[in-house]
Amino acid sequence: GINVYPREVEEVLFKHPNVSDAAVIGIPDEKWGEAIKAYIVTTSSSEGDAEEIRSFCEQEISKIKVPKIIEFINEIPRNAGGKVLKTELRKNHDE
């Protein structure tokens, strides 16, 4: 298997001009065992375009590291210290 580090994918997403915040998690995938899902908060002036963001990512990182699923949300859940609550994101995905 290939190790994909969420931080590496997040750093690419942060370079996109329409992304104001992002978090990446691994989700169960029948074919690969795990797939990449990105939660993205867009800048106030833009709407989310998953295909455009995927194309942007493909120019920066290998295709296997590009998020399979992109979900646009209003806010990334964080604790009082500012750390992303990835357990909350996983719960949201499972629902």
Where are these predicted regions, by residue range?
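AMP-binding/adenylate-forming catalytic core of the ANL superfamily
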Residues: 1-65, 74-75, 82-92
